[in-house]
Structures are given as structure tokens and as C-alpha cells.
Curated annotation (Swiss-Prot):
Protein name: Protein-export protein SecB
Gene Ontology biological-process annotations: protein folding; protein tetramerization; protein transport
Similarity comment: family membership: Belongs to the SecB family.
GO cellular component term, pick one: cytoplasm
Subunit comment: Homotetramer, a dimer of dimers. One homotetramer interacts with 1 SecA dimer.
């Protein structure tokens, strides 16, 4: 066996195998409001899109987690400021995750599970907007890995700032 193959085999052995299984994917909550229909259709369509995304995790049992993806999309018209529509979706899933702990488990729950749920939520939002007879809304993909890294960096920064603000003990 060559040295490269031995190194690759050693690295593969060191990596902990893990299991991620989708148990169920479902809509936990959905709301679509178009408060200014039908008068909004008589205005020039220059939309301003608002997009908010968040995740929530609930541990249901050992190795069993519910992940909820919260997405709020709102559109107002640029000229009048009138709200065209507000769409709120909570797309959820139950996942079995084995073989991960600590930061690796947190990464899976904050990145891999939402990546599974997002296409379902995106399709639901597009369908609701279409049923409201608005122009098609195609939401861009989301890089949940990058969002997780940003979250970790913010946590580190907040911890460092909190440490700086803590007064030093008085010496006698």
C-alpha cells in the first residue's frame, strides 16, 4: 500500500461515521396575506422584497430532533409603500442523527437539516404567491453552511466583547 493510500485510510478511520435520516417533513404553520387586494393590481409593479430566515431545533428524544425553518417573505410597492403580500412559512422535519456531538451536531442541525427543508418551503412560498395571482417569486438558494459560520463568528465576537467588559478583580 502506498503512503498516500495509508494516509487516506487513516483519515477515513479517524472521521466518525454518522447517520442522518429524514423521518418526516411537514408544514408546521403557513400564512398568506394580501391586505391590499384587488386595488394593488392597479398600481405599477415595482416590488421591494423583504426576506427573513431563522431556524429552531427541538430535541425530541435521543438522536431524534425536530428542525423548524421559519421564512417570512413580504413585498411592498416601491412608490406607494403598500403591502402586496406577506407570506410566513414554518417548514419542519423530524431527523434522526447518530454519531455526531458538539459542534458537528450543531452544524448538522443548523445547516444540513435546513438545507433539506428549504426546497419544500421555497416551493410552498412560490405556490402561495402564484395563487394570490402575483408575478412569480423564485427565491434564491441559501448557503446554510455560510450562515452557520457567520453565527459561530458572531458568538465568538460577543464572547470576546463580554470578556473585555468584565471588570478585573480588585487586588489588595
Amino acid at each position: 500500500m502506498s503512503e498516500e493510500n495509508q494516509v487516506a485510510a487513516t483519515e477515513a478511520e479517524e472521521q466518525t461515521p454518522f447517520e442522518l435520516q429524514i423521518q418526516r417533513i411537514y408544514i408546521k404553520d403557513v400564512s398568506f396575506e394580501a391586505p391590499n387586494l384587488p386595488t394593488i393590481f392597479h398600481q405599477e409593479w415595482k416590488p421591494q422584497l423583504g426576506f427573513e430566515l431563522d431556524t429552531e431545533t427541538v430535541k425530541l428524544a435521543d438522536d431524534l430532533y425536530e428542525v423548524i425553518l421559519h421564512i417570512n417573505v413580504s413585498t411592498t410597492l416601491e412608490d406607494s409603500g403598500d403591502t402586496a403580500f406577506i407570506c410566513e412559512v414554518k417548514q419542519a422535519g423530524v431527523f434522526t442523527i447518530k454519531g455526531l456531538e458538539g459542534i458537528q451536531l450543531a452544524h448538522c442541525l443548523a445547516s444540513q437539516c435546513p438545507s433539506v427543508l428549504y426546497p419544500y418551503a421555497r416551493e410552498l412560498i412560490a405556490s402561495l404567491v402564484n395563487r394570490g395571482t402575483f408575478p412569480a417569486l423564485n427565491l434564491s438558494p441559501v448557503n446554510f453552511d455560510a450562515l452557520f459560520v457567520d453565527y459561530l463568528q458572531r458568538q465568538e465576537q460577543e464572547a470576546a466583547e463580554a470578556e473585555e467588559e468584565t471588570p478585573a478583580p480588585a487586588s489588595n
